[in-house]
């Protein structure tokens, strides 16, 4: 598997081809540091606060500063949203920290992949200097469905693929991560499967098919170092993919999310949530196992105990 390791090191330069899929509220500094120390590649759910008309980038700035100081490098995947590109304070983050990997997220309710990889987005990246990241950073884009002939697809260093068996945002497609990967690998140089991954065989299989790395979310969320409370983790040990419900993120959009409900009273039709179930997620992560929800994918089927991050990465790479 030396070729696989070499391919991963060209894109991520980590010991193992295991990347932490960005998880809302769960991709914390503590988890990221543990993943980095264990030889995986970390992510950090660093984001500004406020609305599109009034964005405060200070929390994002200080969170990244804190992580980089503790980690000793800016080797981390951080989300990137279209509306930030015209903000001077965001460009300060770009220039000051030289983050190694940015992942472009679609931020509205339209999950159309053409929107995610639009010419407007790429023009803004270039105009505002983010193109400079190409010299020292990787720019990735999130896809829910295959894209074949988009004129700017070649600019991306990699695309991350999500499907019906992943956790959190899944779009409205019915294709699994593997099915979407099988199509996109014909059109893109680096395709990284996100979601539904929980076994050494899956990891080995994706790498042999040409993936430079695999994205892991649910298994890391169930690790000792994740922010989920111990009570919540114990409750999740009793769950499987049959407990996952595809819920609406909002009433006026197409965003769908795969989640395990810890409270049966949560409305799943999008009529009673703030910010795509953000409050429900907060209650789930920090609760006693009977509150809120947890975004989870089919990787939950492979969680049999609460492991450390190092034990999880050793398990996932045991067939390499």
Predicted segments, located by residue:
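Residue-level detector of alpha-helix initiation sites
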Residues: 26, 197-198
